[in-house]
């Protein structure tokens, strides 16, 4: 259910306003204000999470090992590699606190014993900091929420493959991350069930097996240019493997060409037609905008 630009309350489904229902599955906030929705959930009360910390120089080896484990593992296995400022946590060695480090976060939709077996080749590398635990899925979901009060700039590239050269491009650029800061330089796995959803919806990015997602969080305006350029450089480095399509929420300031690439040219054409039908005056424009034709 949503309120359209002319104040009408509209219910959408595959049978009611199916064009609008389609557009709302990936087209962002361009078509109205959603007031309620119904969706299907899968019960997953507990997950297993491994936090594996390394010095930054170990990043290339760790990233390759993580890639190999995920690509050969079951759908239940996922996660990412993050370069970040190491926090003061129980599993973090004192000599790494406050310094740039490489954190591998492995997630498993199942019990710890099965998780350890699935990621065994990765664990055999040995890490300076290690913690494996079961936790509620909801707790994992909010574990990497951004802290409030910071300046923010981020982007992403969805990769169709992750060869060794792409790993090197990703890990090399970590040296330019602003540290100490809450900024993070992230590579995470997709695929699995998400890649097998309805292919008709305008979310072509979800078939990508890998995502590179640099995001800057900083306080001093004097660092604005440095952080923004770092984000752009990261994306440029891995663009040879990019499929162009990308999750809109990962784009800070997309230009029109990037919007078309993010959604796919055919999808973008359909979305502009829906926009013209429900918001011809572009009332909803303070967003990742799709202009009406």
Identify the residue ranges that each predicted region occupies.
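Soluble FAD-dependent oxygen oxidases
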Residues: 1-293
